[in-house]
């Protein structure tokens, strides 16, 4: 049954690259076979409940710009929001969605009321998933918006806040499991510090390690089969966040013995804030064996902060999905659009148009990445660049020779290496041919 919010807009269909219909896919064809698998199953698109239905269009200099009938802290408004959200999911045709607890329920007076509200909405989600075929990619707890978390959740100096946050995560894992969620995400927006003058760094890291260990322990206790994911971000809202980037998260996981239990959910915008490319973070996660899922968006190239815009740069997406394919593709993860409308984009159809453009951009990137992989366009030059290490001397350097033996061979054989071109321009031109 239609809520009327989207008017007479019909379900979005694939019409091909020649279509000029703004409410149709030009490149995302869910059933198209890419590398032996349906495009839908490669990309595993998800809609973010928070940006799509909870964000009000405000910024640091101005308040709400969006006029949505569900903007109130009442359970009936939350139910209307759920109706509109699932209508949107059905119109768009993305197979998954993601949510924080605070996105979907009103803020209660205490933990018990929050839990009751959440369970009431989960009852509704269960029915709607059965009716629509929608699936939950991941759930998470909002441990950063409420003022109780101003000094962190897992890293808060007050043990009562730690306990409240842990109890909240428990209820959110329960909800995620009940809805068949395939992952559970932890993002530490307030896990960090504004100044070291009032921060016990060692204690806070240990507390965060304890918190994550509790999550993993509970996952196994209740038989939740999904993947636990950490989402790295270097700053914003906190000046310095402990889950700075993939490398930092990996070091943290190793320190607390959790590297085989937890993977990463990598967001493009967060990678940029950390001084990396999206491609870099994906490649490193793949190399370290902790790649899990992605939050797809982009930052404004000029502003220098996390703007969460819909992706529109196909070469960037081609290189990103190239790394995803090298990792073997998604298992429990997927492509969640952690992207929001601009605050002047007021019309309901803008929400569809933003997602359609993002899905088309990702589809083009995936197809380009698949062709590069099939043709060996990047792997062949890479193999040539490192070919010397496959020879007898290269193998001995890595496994048999001591430092003094290496020095002896360099002198005896008069080894005098000359640099070879890295061919960066050639490789960049190859990528552009495929996109």
From Swiss-Prot:
InterPro entries: Xyl_isomerase-like_sf (IPR036237), Xylose_isom_bac (IPR013452), Xylose_isomerase (IPR001998)
Metal-binding is among the record's keywords: yes
Positions that bind Mg(2+) 1: 231, 267, 295, 338
Cofactor binding mode and count: Binds 2 magnesium ions per subunit.
Keyword terms of this UniProt record: Carbohydrate metabolism, Cytoplasm, Isomerase, Magnesium, Metal-binding, Xylose metabolism
GO molecular function: magnesium ion binding; xylose isomerase activity
Catalytic residues (UniProt): 100, 103
Major localization listed first in the record, in broad terms: cytoplasm
Record-listed Mg(2+) 2 binding positions: 267, 270, 306, 308
Record GO cellular component, one term: cytoplasm
Compartments it resides in: Cytoplasm
Example of a GO biological process term: D-xylose metabolic process
Enzyme class, broadest EC rank: isomerase
Transmembrane segments: none
Cofactors named for this entry: Mg(2+)
UniProt EC number: 5.3.1.5
Reactions mediated catalytically: alpha-D-xylose = alpha-D-xylulofuranose
Family (UniProt): Belongs to the xylose isomerase family.
Quaternary assembly: Homotetramer.
The protein, known as: Xylose isomerase
Organism: Brucella suis (strain ATCC 23445 / NCTC 10510)
Lineage summary: Bacteria, Pseudomonadati, Pseudomonadota, Alphaproteobacteria, Hyphomicrobiales
């Amino acid at each position: 049954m239609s809520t009327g919010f989207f008017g007479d807009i019909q379900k979005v269909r694939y019409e091909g690259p020649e279509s000029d219909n703004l409410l149709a896919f030009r490149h995302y064809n869910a059933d198209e076979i890419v590398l032996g698998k349906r495009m839908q199953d490669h990309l595993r698109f998800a809609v973010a409940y928070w940006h799509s239905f909870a964000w009000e269009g405000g910024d640091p200099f101005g308040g709400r710009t969006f006029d949505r009938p569900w903007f109130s802290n009442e359970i009936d408004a939350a139910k209307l929001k759920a109706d509109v959200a699932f209508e949107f999911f059905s119109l768009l045709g993305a197979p998954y969605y993601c949510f924080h607890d605070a996105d979907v329920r009103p803020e209660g007076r205490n933990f018990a009321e929050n839990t009751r509200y959440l369970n009431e909405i989960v009852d509704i989600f269960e029915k709607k998933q059965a009716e629509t075929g929608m699936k939950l990619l991941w759930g998470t707890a909002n441990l950063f918006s409420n003022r109780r978390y101003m000094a962190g959740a897992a890293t808060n100096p007050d043990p009562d806040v730690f306990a409240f946050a842990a109890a909240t995560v428990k209820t959110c894992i329960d909800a995620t499991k009940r809805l068949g969620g395939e992952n559970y995400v932890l993002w530490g927006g307030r896990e960090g510090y504004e100044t070291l003058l009032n921060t016990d760094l060692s204690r806070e890291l240990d507390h965060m390690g304890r918190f994550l260990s509790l999550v993993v322990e509970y996952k196994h206790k209740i038989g939740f089969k999904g993947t636990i994911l950490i989402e790295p971000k270097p700053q914003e809202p906190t000046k310095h966040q402990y889950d700075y980037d993939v490398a930092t998260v990996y070091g943290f996981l190793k320190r607390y013995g959790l590297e085989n239990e937890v993977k990463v959910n990598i967001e493009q915008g967060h990678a940029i804030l950390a001084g990396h490319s999206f491609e870099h973070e994906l490649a490193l996660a793949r190399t370290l064996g902790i790649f899990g899922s992605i939050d797809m968006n982009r930052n404004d190239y000029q502003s220098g902060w996390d703007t969460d815009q819909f992706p529109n740069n196909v070469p960037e997406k081609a290189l990103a999905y190239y790394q995803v394919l090298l990792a073997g593709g998604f298992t429990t993860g997927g492509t969640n659009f952690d992207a929001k409308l601009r605050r002047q984009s007021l019309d309901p159809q803008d929400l569809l148009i933003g997602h359609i453009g993002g899905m088309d951009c990702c589809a083009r990137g995936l197809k380009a990445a698949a062709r590069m992989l099939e043709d060996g366009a990047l792997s062949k030059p890479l193999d040539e660049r490192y070919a010397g290490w496959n020879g007898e001397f290269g193998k001995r350097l890595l496994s048999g020779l001591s430092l003094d033996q290496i020095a002896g061979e360099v002198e005896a054989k008069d080894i005098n290496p000359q640099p070879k071109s890295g061919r960066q321009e050639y490789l960049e031109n190859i990528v552009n041919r495929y996109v």
